[in-house]
Each structure stands twice: as C-alpha cells, then as structure tokens.
C-alpha cells in the first residue's frame, strides 16, 4: 500500500465513521487537521505513532489498517542516534564528523522517510545551523507549523523535544516577540514531570533540552526556575546511569552558585568536579573549554565584587 492508497483508505474509513477531520483530530495534540489532510491526500508519509493514533481513532488494530507497514531502516536509526548522542563542544573534527552523518542521512534515507522523521531531521539540522552560525535564521517554518501545538501539550514526544530544542536555540540567539520568553517559561514548568513520562532510551534528549533551558534562564537572570531543573537533571543521570553531560551540568551549577548565590567556594567545588568528570571520559578538548570558562567567570565575578 503506497502513501496515496493509505490516505484514501483513511479518508474512506473516517467518512464511513461520520467523522469530520476536526472531530477526528479532537484537540489536535496527537495529529492536526493540517497533518491529517496531507496524509489523506497521500502527500505525507505517516509515522508509526501517527498510524497507531489513526487506527485507535478508527477503532481497529494497527495491521488491520496498514498490514504492510515497514519499520525505519536500522542504519538510519543508528545515524540519527549518533548525531543526537555525540556532543561536539565546538570541536571542529567532531563537527565535521556530525556533518558527514547528516549528509549520509539526507543522501541515502531522507526521501523515503515518514513525514515525522523528516521533520525530526530538519529540526536537528536547523538546530545545528543556528548554533554554528549564531543566528536565529533556521527552522522557522518548522516552528510556525508545530510549536503552538507542542506548547499546549502536557506530554512531549521525541519529535516535540527536538522542536523545542530548536525553539530554545533560536531564542538564545534572539527573542523576536515578547510572548516567546513567556512560552519558554511555561515549557520550563512542564519539563520536570516529563522525566517519568519520556521513554528511558529517550531521556538524553529531554536532558539536553533542560540543559539548554538552564543556560537560557541564566542568560536572562531568571534564576528561580533553575534549582527544579537541576533536580530533574540529577534524577535523569541517576535513573539512566548516563553521566556524559555531567561536566556540563556542573558547569551550569558553578555559574548558578557564582551569579545567583554569590558563593565562590561552592562554585569552585562544582568546577573541580566538572573537570574530574571530563578527565574520566577522556575529553581533553572539553577540559580546556571548562578551564577557559572558569577563568572568564572568575574574572567577571571578581570585577562585579562577587569573589
């Protein structure tokens, strides 16, 4: 069954059930009217989660609706995982390696991906582009299409988190509208509860979103939101026993102690722990970045009378 045939089948079954697209999509948190329209027209390849939702709304089993569903290619899934799991810390060699992985995804897999996977890849690439160019000029079409829907959700999917990360990176570069930062604060209040809702294998994506959020909160001096995020980040690391980003978490903690609590002794403790973890994972480039950042913070704090 190709995309056009599947779309026709969904439309016929929906109409047989006497449901309008608006009724079918309900609150549009799982699928929007626009997304359903594209699926029914055969111009959008639905993902597994969308097919599951459609089947549930139609009151039938997944394979009753689409018996020839094929899962994502194993190589593609590995490439995507490696891109998301490998931090570069502005290391040019690692940035080039990540670019090569993304090129392979676009060249070998992108054209045949379901729409939701295409959105995920485009969100990842746009986030990389914003970060590397330091300009909020990428991924705006994704945010325009999906962010409002995501903002209203109580539970976030992996795709939602990737789009939120894109939103945060853009926001870090430029606050375009006064409502943008308020939306961000509303999202921040939802993040801690997601620790129990997100699949354990995907918690590292939530972790990265919260790390970006802490950095943005510190940048805007909204310190009161930060301790709750620290607790959630510590919980994720203990739950997953994944301490890959522990040096970065400690970097954020030392900055919080310096700039929010004016406590240079506690800040130094977190700095030393950050360097220790960076040494444990054998990342010399990260150690240099941590030491450089610490020296800058010490001079800044001293200048402002905080040391």
Label for each model-derived stretch:
Residues 17-38:
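Short alpha-helical DNA-recognition segment
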Residues 88-105, 132-148, 177-191, 220-232, ...:
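Helix-turn-helix repeat elements of alpha-solenoid scaffolds
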Residues 1-17:
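A short, Lys/Arg-rich alpha-helix, primarily the initiator
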Residues 164-260:
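Alpha-helical adaptor scaffolds
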Residues 104-117, 132, 146-161, 191-203, ...:
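Flexible helix-coil transition and linker loops at the boundaries of alpha-helical arrays
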Residues 74-132:
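Helix-turn-helix/homeodomain-like alpha-helical modules used for DNA recognition
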Residues 49-64:
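DNA major-groove recognition helix of helix-turn-helix/homeodomain DNA-binding modules
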Residues 81-84, 117-128, 166-169, 208-216, ...:
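"A position-specific structural signal for the A-helix of alpha-solenoid helical repeats
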């Amino acid at each position: 069954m190709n995309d056009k045939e599947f779309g026709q089948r969904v439309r016929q079954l929906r109409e047989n059930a006497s449901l309008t697209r608006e009724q079918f999509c309900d609150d549009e948190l799982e699928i929007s009217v626009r997304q359903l329209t594209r699926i029914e027209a055969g111009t959008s390849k639905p993902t597994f989660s969308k097919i599951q939702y459609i089947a549930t709304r139609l009151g039938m089993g997944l394979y009753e609706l689409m018996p020839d569903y094929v899962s994502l290619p194993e190589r593609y899934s590995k490439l995507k995982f490696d891109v998301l799991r490998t931090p570069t810390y502005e290391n040019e060699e690692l940035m080039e390696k990540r670019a090569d992985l993304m090129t392979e995804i676009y060249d070998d897999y992108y054209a045949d991906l379901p729409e939701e996977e295409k959105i995920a890849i485009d969100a990842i690439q746009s986030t990389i582009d914003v970060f590397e160019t330091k300009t909020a000029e990428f991924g705006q079409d994704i945010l325009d299409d999906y962010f409002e829907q995501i903002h209203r959700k109580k539970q976030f999917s992996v795709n939602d988190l990737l789009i939120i990360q894109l939103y945060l990176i853009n926001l870090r570069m430029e606050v375009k509208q006064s409502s943008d930062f308020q939306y961000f604060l509303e999202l921040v209040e939802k993040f801690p509860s997601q620790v129990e809702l997100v699949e354990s294998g995907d918690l590292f994506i939530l972790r990265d979103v919260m790390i970006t959020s802490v950095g943005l909160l510190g940048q805007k001096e909204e310190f009161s939101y930060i301790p709750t995020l620290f607790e959630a980040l510590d919980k994720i690391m203990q739950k997953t026993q994944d301490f890959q980003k522990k040096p970065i978490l400690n970097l954020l903690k030392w900055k919080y102690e310096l700039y929010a609590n004016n406590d240079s002794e506690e800040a130094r403790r977190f700095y030393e722990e950050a360097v220790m973890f960076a040494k444990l994972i054998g990342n010399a480039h990260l150690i240099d970045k941590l030491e450089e950042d610490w020296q800058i913070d010490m001079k800044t704090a001293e200048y402002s009378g905080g040391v």
